Design a protein with these regions (language model features):
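ATP-binding/phosphotransfer module of carbohydrate and carboxylate kinases, centering on a glycine-rich
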Residues: 1-58, 103-108, 153-278
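Acidic-glycine-rich active-site phosphate/pyrophosphate-binding loop
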Residues: 15, 75, 118-131, 246-255
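Conserved phosphate-binding catalytic cores of ATP/NTP-utilizing and phosphoryl-transfer enzymes
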Residues: 88-112
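Short, acidic/small-residue loops that bind anionic groups at enzyme active sites
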Residues: 86-95, 140, 261-264
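Glycine/charged-rich beta-loop-alpha catalytic/anionic-binding loops adjacent to active sites
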Residues: 81-83, 128-136, 253-260
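Glycine-rich phosphate-binding loop of actin/hexokinase-like ATP-binding domains
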Residues: 107-157
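Glycine-rich beta-strand-to-loop/alpha-helix junction loops that act as flexible
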Residues: 62-69, 114-117, 233-243
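Short beta-strand-loop/turn "lid" adjacent to the catalytic site in phosphate-handling enzymes
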Residues: 49-91, 103-104, 183-187
């Protein structure tokens, strides 16, 4: 049995390969910088129940996750998953390498992620060969769901959002200013909370103000292409939840920034299954 996981900060998509059988399930996200040992244990038990793995031992686990850019983070993932799911071997890599393998296979390319967070790299066909430093949802994550959510919430609280949208935003999120601040600075997973606000942008994306917000955040993302020098002329393959919500807007911002887009998919899991079946 082989188990493949694509884990963002919000959700994890699992696929169990057992002979010709292919079983899928979705659990909570397992970013080792945001989720603790208890969350990993809970997800492990859910996973065993949903995939019928109680008492079983998985031969190989391939885990691609947000927050898995350092060896210490990867070690935590191996250790914490191993406490509830026995395995013979486990390979933990970043979600960015997962996006690369899913879209490029063994070919070179530029690859990006636009989901709860964001990232971008040059992939040489074997590894992530060039990548900007990922500074997380407070300092970075340009173009991501939490970037859009952060912009909306700031405009709402500072009364810069148009009145009609502000009223609708309040209907959807009837919180006081203090409650919003509490969600960001005191409660767990503030990045998920901010990213959840991007659904409001998706519901009202025909609005001129909302178009400006989406395009502004997307342009900030594509401005990062200049870091990659000659590689920036390659098509950029994009993976992530924002692809389904803002595909047209992302395409327009890319064209306006002189960026050629390649494959655009919401989830890399099917590409990863194909990669590991080869």
């Amino acid at each position: 049995m082989r188990l493949i996981a694509d884990s963002g900060s919000t959700k994890t998509h699992w696929v169990l390969l057992n002979g010709e059988q292919e079983l899928h399930c979705v659990t909570e996200g397992l970013n080792p910088w945001m989720a603790d040992r208890g969350v990993f244990a809970l997800v492990g038990r859910q996973l065993c129940g949903q995939l019928g793995l109680e008492g079983a031992r998985v031969e190989q686990v391939f885990f691609y996750g947000a927050g898995c850019g350092t060896e210490s983070a990867c070690q935590r993932v191996r250790e914490w998953i191993g406490e509830t799911l026995p395995f013979d071997s486990m390979e933990v890599n970043s979600d960015l390498l997962g996006a690369c393998r899913a879209t490029c296979g063994s070919r070179e390319g530029m690859v990006g992620i636009l989901g709860t967070g964001s990232n971008m790299c040059y992939y040489n066909g074997q590894r992530v060969a060039l990548q900007r430093v990922s500074t997380g949802f407070i300092l970075g994550d340009e173009g991501s769901g939490n970037h859009i959510g952060k912009r909306l919430l700031k405009d709402y609280l500072e009364e810069r959002m148009p009145e009609d949208l502000r009223a609708m935003f309040h209907d959807d999120y009837p919180y006081t200013t203090a409650e919003f601040i509490d969600c960001i600075y005191r409660r767990p997973f503030p990045n998920r909370f901010l990213a959840s606000l991007a659904s409001f942008a998706a519901s009202h994306k025909e609005n001129q103000y909302m178009q400006e917000v989406i395009h502004s955040c997307s342009r900030a993302y594509f401005e990062q292409m200049t870091y990659f020098g000659e590689h920036a002329s390659l098509p950029l393959h994009v993976v992530g939840g924002l692809v389904s919500s803002f595909e047209a807007e992302i395409g327009e911002a890319a064209a306006g920034s002189g960026v050629r887009l390649g494959v655009m998919v919401q989830s890399p899991i099917e590409g990863l299954v194909s990669f590991h079946k080869e």
